[in-house]
Amino acid sequence: MRQKSLNVLEFDKIKALIENETISDLGKEKVVDMAPATDFNTVEFQMNETDEISQIYNKHRMPSLSGLAKISTYIHRAKIGGVLSVSELNVIKRLIQIQNQYKTFYNNLLNEEETINYPILNDRMEQLPVLSDLYQSIHQKCDTYDLYDNASYELQGIRSKISSTNQRIKQNLDKIVKSQANQKKLSDAIVTVRNERNVIPVKAEYRQDFNGIVHDQSASGQTLYIEPSSIVEMSNQISRLKNDEAIERERILSALTVEVAEEADACLISESIMGQIDFLTAKARYASSIKGTKPQFTKDRTVYLPKAFHPLLDKQTVVANTIEFAQDIETVIITGPNTGGKTVTLKTLGLIIVMAQSGILIPTLDGSQLSIFENVYCDIGDEQSIEQSLSTFSSHMKNIVEILQDTTKNSLILFDELGAGTDPSEGAALAMSILDHVHEIGSLVMATTHYPELKAYSYNREGVMNASVEFDVNTLSPTYKLLMGVPGRSNAFDISKKLGLNMKVIQKAKSMIGQDEQEINEMIASLESNSKRVDEQRIELDYLLREAQDTHDALAKQYEQYQNHEKQLMNEAKEKANQRVKSATKEADDILKELRELRDQKGADVKEHELIDKKKQLDDQYEAKSLKQNVQKKKWDEINAGDEVKVLTYGQKGEVLELIDNNEAVVQMGIIKMKLPLEDLEKTKKTKSEPTKMIKRENRQSIKMELDLRGYRYDEAMVAVDQYLDQAVLSNYEQVYIIHGKGTGALQKGVQNHLKRHKSVASYRNGMPSEGGFGVTVVEIK
């Protein structure tokens, strides 16, 4: 899309606001590269992608992306045989940790809300690679700044020797500096370091009393820094051990780097996906700040923006307006007073289209509709912008020439004060001719003007609509409200009257302009009133229609769930019946086997065909029980309304409410009322009702990543924290959030003091602004 137009519309400021919401350089780079797309499928995909994350962001606390950083340079170095440092490996480890936490969060989300559907995010979560082995390798060997002592058996042995040797050196030196005989010979009773060797400060005149190596002297030469001979060999041993340590450290880091290289492609996939999520989350945060909504994109030429406002203006004072190109309308001409909001309307339309085609939720009410534009062209003087000064007629015309050369049918053109800066009669004629030319091309146009000739232009051309910005004659100021379909009218007489001009002067002036023009002004005033009323009614109707559609969707969903539940009950009943039949058949086979054994042992006169007949009788009986309706072969007592019965298909008890045609009965089973055949019912004796037992259902799903303590007393909160942290440890969480609110700060202080002493807590900190600030404590689990 034309960069000049993006600059005029100040799209760079929108990008800067979104960039401020990102966490990582990965997200920032994607914001910098963000530009409006022009392919329908791409635009729709980008918007759906942002909308999915926005829905989640507005309803849930999302996992922190803090610490997410670029790893591509590290991966490249690993692939070409370089060795990564501990800090670089920890950056890769943090990426894996973030992706795992996000995947856990998403899986918990699916468990909580079985009916949610986030297809794009779901695809991304499925693409996330499994990097558990690499994570564990780094986690077990790398501390924050160095390798753990137990990163390898050899490293542990070397560091143990270094530690014990240092201890011996310390004991030896302490003995020397604390010796009473040496107190007057030392400049100071301390041990210091020179050239990476432990030394003691000896007065120069006592040099001969100390055997050792002089490593340095003071500026005055009165103090010599001597390494006593008793520790020289031990210090040499330390040097050798440190060299061994460096070699072993390099070996471990090389091995870890090889593991990274083996997972290079997977790590880059993870980086790309989590960078995209950072980018989308930033767009979601920005959308939340402007209450952005998702537009519907259409392949027909459509622009409908209900209650749209400019996102860079003060949200407390900005006036929202409905901007629309009605059916078959290709040109909208806006008239009205200076500083009345005409230019802001143009920029609002252009900026919203650019935002939408960049996958950013737009500042309108729900229900907006947009087509996709190949380009947005602007000729806006920008006298209201700090960046530019008033353009001359020549510069305007040069810009218009470029626009007319490049524009297409699928373009949007925004003209501000078309034809201004020259003789009014020539300017008006030129403006109408330009609009005619653009109409022939087929571009959509919104233009502002002061020329009264252009008010009549729409009545002589098809596809052209007037609009105006409202002026309040009572306050003598613009209201910044846009009136679609209503041309601007002169307010000179009303303003003059309000300011106290003599009525005779006003009446004489009215007589000079002619009756027709007075009637036109009165007609326009009537149109303004009607337009405002219709606009309000339309918004109300749109709201009611959306509400009705939401209700319909909810009912359809509930009906589908009911049908699925009923089907599940039937399947469970059939399965239970089949299991009973299987058990009965096995029992029959066992009985026949015993009968045959008994016959063989006793020599009983039982023929094989008799046994087979008996088996057949059993088979007949069990087959009857396995039928869909579980038909009974026996004749049961007569069933009447009010009887308590057992429903054989479901194995549940119920009460007969009424009989239907002696073949069916209406039975109440708990909250379910069903019509069933009599042959599926077995009459039972009425039992005394027992007290209802409460069954506690254990929640086996993973716990949430946050604990909300708001409203808890101190003692209750501490118990809840202990229980929650135990569950978090069992769930393998590494980071959780404890919400205590700000209030007086007493609960926050109590929680953090408690965390200090908790065995499962590695560290804790106050939440960042994006995490809830001082109202949240972020806990790192050991």
Swiss-Prot record:
Organism domain of life: Bacteria
Signal sequence residues: none
InterPro entries to which the protein is assigned, alphabetical: DNA_mismatch_repair_MutS_C, DNA_mismatch_repair_MutS_core, DNA_mismatch_repair_MutS_sf, MSSS, MutS, MutS2, P-loop_NTPase, Smr_dom
Pfam families, sorted: MSSS (PF20297), MutS_V (PF00488), Smr (PF01713)
Enzyme class: hydrolase
Binding-site residues, ATP: 336-343
SMART domains associated with the record: MUTSac, MUTSd, SMR
Keyword check for Transport: no
Any one of the GO BP annotations: mismatch repair
A molecular-function term among this protein's GO annotations: ribosomal large subunit binding
Key words, A-Z: ATP-binding, DNA-binding, Endonuclease, Hydrolase, Nuclease, Nucleotide-binding, RNA-binding, rRNA-binding
Gene3D superfamilies for the chain: 3.30.1370.110, P-loop containing nucleotide triphosphate hydrolases
EC numbers: 3.1.-.-, 3.6.4.-
Domain spans labelled Smr: 707-782
Keyword presence, Transmembrane: no
Family indicated by similarity: Belongs to the DNA mismatch repair MutS family. MutS2 subfamily.
Subunit structure: Homodimer. Binds to stalled ribosomes, contacting rRNA.
Function, as annotated: Endonuclease that is involved in the suppression of homologous recombination and thus may have a key role in the control of bacterial genetic diversity. Acts as a ribosome collision sensor, splitting the ribosome into its 2 subunits. Detects stalled/collided 70S ribosomes which it binds and splits by an ATP-hydrolysis driven conformational change. Acts upstream of the ribosome quality control system (RQC), a ribosome-associated complex that mediates the extraction of incompletely synthesized nascent chains from stalled ribosomes and their subsequent degradation. Probably generates substrates for RQC.
Protein name, UniProt field: Endonuclease MutS2
Annotated source species: Staphylococcus saprophyticus subsp. saprophyticus (strain ATCC 15305 / DSM 20229 / NCIMB 8711 / NCTC 7292 / S-41)
The gene coding this protein: mutS2
